[in-house]
Amino acid sequence: MQFIDQAIIDVKAGSGGDGISAFRREKYVPAGGPAGGDGGQGGNVVLEADDNLQTLLDFKFQKLISAENGQRGGPNKCTGASGKDTVLKVPCGTEVRHLSTNIILGDLTNKGQQLIVAFGGKGGFGNARYLSNSNRAPEKFTEGKVGEEWSLQLELKLLAEVGIIGLPNAGKSTLISVLSSARPKIADYPFTTLIPNLGVVRRPSGDGTVFADIPGLISGASKGIGLGHDFLRHIERTKVLLHLIDSASTDPINDFKTINEELTSYGHGLISRPRIFVLNKKELLNEHEIKKLLNKIEKLTMKKVHIISAVTKFGLDDLLSSIWYELGY
């Protein structure tokens, strides 16, 4: 499935129906009064969060979304039918902005949550509305109001409590695959993961916690280099970051510093987000090398650093215990 996490759409609410000018015409009522009905309300355009959707792909080619117009009024003071609302399903985690002003209209995070993004126009008045003591036979009526029309930007930010970050080939996809039932593409070269992978990891209580493997973080990612700028937004909602370091890389210390710099540059409070530091690929180093590297990383972080092997599953139970503790479970 192609992963689309941004889309621009045009929405147009329905216009209100026109009121009409009509008079009561009955056999024994020679001076029937005004009886023109009001127009119906235009339909709204509504977005609704749906947890069965994972991408904004449906909006890639669906550019204009409109709602029904209200119907014109009828005789005998009959109000025209209101236009039907158009309800669009979007993934949970979709943020909606006005394209021209960048103002956030809403953030659809919960299943079934709705947001009206374009209001339908009000129906016009029929001439029955203008009856007065001074005018017993008004002919005046009004047209319906035009429905709202906007260009919107939809931006999907994944709803995961734990975000797994690190340079390409640090072992993020392998880790999420052994902790959960997720089956991401895994290979021994950088940029295997081109879309965020989600996996549900079971807590001791049996409840699930969503983990996200965030791809594409390289030096300059926060400035749009590589894939990182597109995916950094997906860790904005996370509660805990799992910072994975490839202990067998050419320069693990520099790798650690690179990710730190990108989190700082991107902003949005990511650098101050609770973080658990993890040295992965223990199986590729001897005990002396691991201990030496561990000491260096702990001096930089001033925190405990976990040593794991996602391949052999060494240290995963201890790592999970730390994650549950940080999340308050």
UniProtKB/Swiss-Prot annotation:
Residues 1-159 form the Obg domain. This is GTPase Obg. It is found in: Cytoplasm. Monomer. It holds the Pfam family MMR_HSR1. One of its GO terms (molecular function) is ATP binding. An essential GTPase which binds GTP, GDP and possibly (p)ppGpp with moderate affinity, with high nucleotide exchange rates and a fairly low GTP hydrolysis rate. Plays a role in control of the cell cycle, stress response, ribosome biogenesis and in those bacteria that undergo differentiation, in morphogenesis control. Residues 160-328 form the OBG-type G domain. The lineage of its organism: Bacteria, Bacillati, Cyanobacteriota, Cyanophyceae, Synechococcales. Belongs to the TRAFAC class OBG-HflX-like GTPase superfamily. OBG GTPase family. The keyword Magnesium applies. InterPro entries: G_OBG, GTP-bd, GTP-bd_Obg/CgtA, GTP1_OBG_dom, GTP1_OBG_dom_sf, OBG_GTPase, P-loop_NTPase. CDD domains: Obg.
